From Swiss-Prot:
Organism the protein comes from: Bacillus subtilis (strain 168)
Other notes: B.subtilis strain 168 possesses two thymidylate synthases, a major form ThyA and a minor form ThyB.
Gene Ontology molecular function terms on file: thymidylate synthase activity
Protein's recorded name: Thymidylate synthase 2
GO CC annotation: cytosol
Active-site residues per Swiss-Prot or TrEMBL entry: C146 (nucleophile)
Lineage: Bacteria, Bacillati, Bacillota, Bacilli, Bacillales
Binding site for dUMP: R21, R126, R127, R166, S167, A168, D169, N177, H207, I208, Y209
Listed EC numbers: 2.1.1.45
Effect in UniProt of substituting R39Q: In strain: ATCC 6633
Amino acid sequence: MKQYKDFCRHVLEHGEKKGDRTGTGTISTFGYQMRFNLREGFPMLTTKKLHFKSIAHELLWFLKGDTNVRYLQENGVRIWNEWADENGELGPVYGSQWRSWRGADGETIDQISRLIEDIKTNPNSRRLIVSAWNVGEIDKMALPPCHCLFQFYVSDGKLSCQLYQRSADVFLGVPFNIASYALLTMIIAHVTGLEPGEFIHTFGDVHIYQNHIEQVNLQLERDVRPLPQLRFARKVDSIFNFAFEDFIIEDYDPHPHIKGAVSV
C-alpha cells in the first residue's frame, strides 16, 4: 500500500534516534495519519506477506473479552506469548476493557455491545467511542494498550472508523493494526446494515526499531500490488457470532514474508 510506504519513508526521513523501554533503540517521530478507503479493497500489506489467521483470531479473541492466550495458542497464534504469565494470563488487556470495563463504582460496561446499539439507534452520535485506556487498571496489564481508542462515524449509509494509537511499531505492529481495525469496521458495518467507509489511522509515537531498518528498506524497494478483497461467507446477525471461517480473503498476492525480532 502506498500509504504505508509513504509512512515508512516519513519516519526514516524525519525521525530521530531515540531510546525506548525495550533497550533496542528506535528511529522515532511523533504524529502521523493514514487513510484507507475500504471500498477500494481490504488494506492488508502486499510488500510482505501477512498472516491473516493471526489478525482475525486476535480480533475475535478481543471481541470475546478473553485475556488468556489459550484460545490464541489453540488456533496457532503466538503473537501474545511473550507477555503472558505462566498460566497464560495477561491481566485486564484489550478484551477486558472492550467487553467489561470496570468503572470506579465497580460496575462493568460492555463497550462493544453499547457501541453496536448506539450505531443502530443513534448513528449521528459523536460518542461512538471505545477506549482500552483504563487508567485505574494500566498497572495490572501485561502490556498497556498501544491502540488505545477508536471512534466510529456514520454518514450516507457508510461506517468509518478512526483509531488513535499511542505507540506504533512501524514494521511489525502497524500492518497488523491496519488490517485488524479494517476488519473490525467491516464486521460492524455488516451487523448494523451499513457499508464500509474509511479506516483512518492516527498515531502518537511512531517508531522503527533499529533492528528493523534493513527490513523496512527492503519493503520500500518492493512494488505495491493490488489489494485483496474480503467477503463474508454468510450473513451474521451478531458481532459475537463471527468465526474465523466467516472471513474469505480473495486475490491476495503479496511479496514474501520478512522476519523481524519482537522487542518485549
